[in-house]
Amino acid sequence: MEFSTSSFIFDDDTPPKCPLATKASFIFSVYIIIGLIISYLLQIFRIVRLGSSQGLSFSYLILGYIGVLNAFSNVIALQISPLTECCQNYYSKKQCFANTTGLIQVGSQVLIMGCVLMAFWMFLPRPIHFVAADDENGLPIPEPLSVTKSRKWRKASYGLLGVFTWGLFIICLSATVLSSNFAWAAFLGFSASFCAVVQYVPQIIKTIRHQSHGALSIPMMMMQTPGGFLIGYLLSRLPGTNWTTYMMYIVSACLQGLLLMLCMFYLHKEKSRRKREELQATLQEEESQRAVRILEAETGPE
């Protein structure tokens, strides 16, 4: 299928800072938004289905969310002013909407990743989520839940509160007093790229240590890895943006591909182990039945 490269409006008088979105880029942007939402819903559904977020690194999720928040604020800081000017003076309504899809992409990722964080927090494994109070002898009471929350639960709660506060703070700054501030945008872009690199380290370590992907959704990563490269390309075409805006997505896609291969390796290894165990159990059952038949043949009927 060939996509038309024609724009939504045909006006050669638009300045270079107001590029016209093509039909192809608009269609790809819509697909990316839908794909992002579906991919993160797959992660949420896996956590809910397992009833546990075991195997997911909290540092991985928090750093990833900070990176997305910073990238969203970077797009706001660089794009709001030129996009407003272009929409008021040069774009038609269709073209204005088409050129806001990049902002919608990153914004939808902020919202849905926040839902993933909440799902992680709600389904923390109970032995980690809560600790039991001590009885009169100083021994822990074996109860699944307790009023006294665990240290890790408090850490996750404070972490969520802190990152949501940070997100609200930088988004407000980027949309108001620091709009079109290139130094601020560069800081956000570099920090987003840094988080994109560092976030995968704790998850890779946790995956190798457990030798399992746990609650981490492989279908989510299979959708997001190629999508990350496409998002980076589409963001590079937006008015007012530069390489600090899309670099995070390129780096994230590369490292997520590495994590995906690691998870698929351990999944294949686990399936092979289960097949060997099932085969061994079948052989043992057949051997037991054969031994019973031999014993019955030797002893004969009573």
Curated annotation (Swiss-Prot):
Residue ranges of domain PQ-loop in the record: 175-245
Ranges that cross the membrane: 25-45, 58-78, 104-124, 158-178, 182-202, 215-235, 247-267
Coiled coil: none
Subcellular location: Membrane
Pfam families: PQ-loop
Key words, A-Z: Membrane, Transmembrane, Transmembrane helix
Superkingdom assignment: Eukaryota
Principal location listed in the UniProt entry: membrane
UniProt membrane topology term: Multi-pass membrane protein
One of the record's GO cellular component terms: membrane
Record-given protein name: Uncharacterized protein C4C5.03
